[in-house]
């Protein structure tokens, strides 16, 4: 065996080591992607829960939302302000989830429940607010939300399972 043969064996070993390293990195990348998606879902779930909790823990806010079913004009000025900013937070949180789904950080199937919650709100009690405020959101989100709202799929007034009658 001459030096050229030893050099060829060395190149083969280096190529195999490179392939093993690439395989290892691919496995690590897949695990990291899975962990990122899980973490994104967990954070999204917590954010949406905070939105719901603000209503369940604040009787006055709950009354404002129920009153808003009769239109924004039925609200007093301080109620309009509270309703506006609560809606802004709720919809902004969902917009962030929608964007994460576009980026692939969360699977679209995982956001269906969040989607139903917010779009039910925007289709009914929050519809007037949405028409007045949607310019504050990204244009692609606005097109998406309007398409979903106009589908007529979201019939409940505030949230699936919540009766405010």
Identify the residue ranges that each predicted region occupies.
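Membrane-embedded hydrophobic alpha-helical segments
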Residues: 1-39
């Amino acid at each position: 065996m001459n030096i050229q043969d030893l050099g060829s064996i060395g190149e083969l070993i280096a190529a195999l080591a490179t392939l093993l390293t690439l395989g290892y990195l691919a496995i690590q990348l897949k695990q990291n992607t899975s962990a990122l998606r899980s973490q994104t879902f967990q954070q999204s779930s917590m954010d949406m829960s905070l939105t719901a909790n603000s209503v369940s823990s604040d009787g006055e806010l709950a009354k404002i939302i129920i009153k808003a079913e009769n239109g924004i004009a039925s609200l007093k000025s301080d109620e309009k302000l509270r309703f506006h900013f609560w809606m802004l937070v709720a919809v902004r949180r969902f917009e962030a989830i929608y964007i994460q789904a576009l980026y692939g950080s969360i699977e679209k199937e995982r956001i269906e429940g969040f989607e139903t919650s917010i779009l039910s709100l925007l289709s009914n009690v929050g519809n007037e607010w949405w028409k007045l405020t949607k310019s504050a959101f990204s244009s692609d989100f606005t097109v998406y939300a309007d398409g979903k709202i106009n589908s007529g799929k979201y019939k409940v007034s505030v949230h699936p399972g919540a009766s405010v009658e």
